[in-house]
């Protein structure tokens, strides 16, 4: 069955819609961390470096979780994994309202919410979407990653307003219950691939459209063969550096604003503005990645997220922070969104894309952990955020040579997972052959 003919649309669009909702709500706590810092300092008297360590801990604990989720998703499917992750996020958010000690914050946020809960959605959803769509992949991934930017737009000001007006306990009790319910319901709409429902990927609904001379019964490329090549590690390194650079900003820009005398809700709006404008870059850079490949995509995004940081050295008024938020957001989202598309171009759909993406997310996770902790610790040492900003700027520029060293891209139409040409018929660049999508 190629279509849900009764309704006249392909189930791939249901998967995309559900994935977007999950993407928004799964990131509620993680993407809003910056608005928690000042209330925690005021309520408990904790140091900013100690608080931001929870942000780092979430990504560090998430490293093995990301690897495990990628492996399990490739073998057993994603739905049950995401149901469990939704329960963790909902329960953890609920328990955030009951914390009284720093170690409790580390356990609930660092383990339950920010790492083990968030990891499943982060790794599995982008890979599932690449399996469901053959045509319009760049646009579809743009829609998906654009939705990721809506989470902070909604939840950063909501959390801050509720914390200031309803208190810590009531805020997290209510939001925890809502998150758990929504994540559980929408996870039920996700299926690992079109084959589960007897469908083809969107754009390959007719047998006549399938590439000739292919067979889905032929063996896929093994992960160990891919990991012997350097490009996976290079991509993971780029993701690490890029995430370290923008984690300093995302975890601390609200505190940077309040440190300069900006009111709390107004400062939270800076983070929401970054997220809102990043919707544009997440959408645009997904299309750029599909058309022009990783080299151009990652070079532009790293440069675009680094240069605006200079503005913050001179920011004292709210309008300057909002100007920064707009300029920074227009490129920062591009650093994250291209990797699933780049992987499909470089490795093909017969490769274990979930496992490959999980390796890159390890790079991202260590970068986010490092950046979040460094930003707070440098403030505690120096009493200002100048050194934190300098660290973000330097990290971004370090990633540029790595991005420029990636293979040049040559646009081709990727082959869907059910009908992909095996490695021996269309050699992967990782196995020494010329792959579609690459120019030597």
Which residues make up each language-model segment?
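Extracytoplasmic gate region of multi-pass secondary transporters
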Residues: 33-38, 224-287, 371
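Hydrophobic core of transmembrane alpha-helices in multi-pass small-molecule transporters
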Residues: 92, 104-120, 320-334
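C-terminal transmembrane helical hairpin of 12-TM major facilitator-type secondary transporters
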Residues: 245-246, 266, 272-342
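A late C-terminal transmembrane helix in Major Facilitator Superfamily
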Residues: 143, 152, 347-384
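Conserved MFS/SLC helix-loop-helix module at the cytosolic interface between two early adjacent transmembrane helices
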Residues: 64-103, 289, 295
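Cytoplasmic helix-loop-helix junction between adjacent transmembrane helices
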Residues: 109-146, 348
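Symmetry-related core transmembrane helices of the 12-TM Major Facilitator Superfamily/SLC fold
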Residues: 172-189, 387-405
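Helix-loop-helix hairpin linking two adjacent transmembrane segments in secondary transporters
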Residues: 135, 144-197
């Amino acid at each position: 069955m190629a279509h849900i003919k009764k309704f006249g649309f392909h189930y791939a669009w249901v998967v995309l819609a559900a994935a977007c909702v999950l993407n928004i709500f799964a990131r509620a706590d993680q993407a809003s961390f910056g608005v928690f810092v000042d209330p925690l300092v005021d309520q408990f008297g904790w140091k900013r470096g100690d608080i931001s360590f929870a942000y780092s801990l979430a990504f560090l604990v998430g490293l093995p979780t990301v690897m495990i989720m990628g492996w399990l998703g490739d073998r057993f499917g994603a739905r049950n994994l995401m149901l469990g992750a939704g329960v963790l996020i909902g329960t953890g958010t609920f328990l955030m309202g009951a914390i009284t000690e720093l170690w409790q914050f580390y356990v609930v946020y660092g383990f339950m919410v920010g790492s083990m809960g968030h990891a499943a959605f982060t790794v599995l959803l982008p890979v599932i979407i690449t399996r469901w769509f053959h045509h319009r992949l760049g646009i579809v991934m743009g829609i998906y990653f654009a939705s990721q930017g809506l989470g902070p737009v909604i939840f950063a000001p909501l959390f801050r307003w509720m914390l200031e007006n309803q208190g810590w306990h009531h805020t997290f009790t209510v939001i925890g219950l809502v998150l758990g319910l929504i994540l559980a319901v929408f996870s039920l709409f996700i299926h690992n691939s079109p084959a589960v429902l007897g469908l083809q990927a969107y754009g390959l609904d007719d047998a006549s459209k399938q590439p000739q001379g292919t067979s889905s019964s032929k063996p896929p490329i093994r992960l160990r063969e891919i990991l012997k090549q350097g490009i996976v590690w290079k991509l993971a390194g780029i993701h690490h550096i890029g995430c370290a650079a923008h984690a300093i900003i995302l975890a601390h820009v609200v505190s940077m604003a309040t440190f300069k005398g900006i009111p709390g809700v107004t400062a939270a709006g800076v983070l929401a503005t970054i997220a809102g404008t990043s919707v544009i870059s997440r959408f645009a850079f997904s299309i750029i990645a599909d058309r022009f490949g990783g080299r151009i995509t990652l070079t532009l995004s790293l440069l675009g997220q680094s240069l605006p940081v200079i503005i913050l050295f001179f920011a004292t008024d709210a309008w300057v922070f909002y100007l920064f938020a707009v300029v920074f957001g227009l490129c920062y989202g591009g650093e994250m969104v291209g990797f699933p598309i780049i992987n499909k171009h470089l490795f093909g759909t017969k490769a274990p894309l979930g496992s490959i993406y999980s390796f890159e997310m390890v790079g991202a996770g260590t970068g986010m952990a490092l950046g979040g902790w460094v930003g707070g610790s440098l403030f505690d040492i120096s009493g200002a955020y100048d050194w934190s900003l300098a660290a973000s700027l330097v990290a971004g520029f370090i990633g540029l040579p790595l991005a420029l060293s990636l293979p040049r891209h040559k646009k081709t139409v990727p082959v869907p997972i059910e009908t992909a040409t095996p490695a021996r018929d269309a050699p992967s660049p990782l196995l020494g052959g010329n792959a579609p999508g690459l120019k030597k």
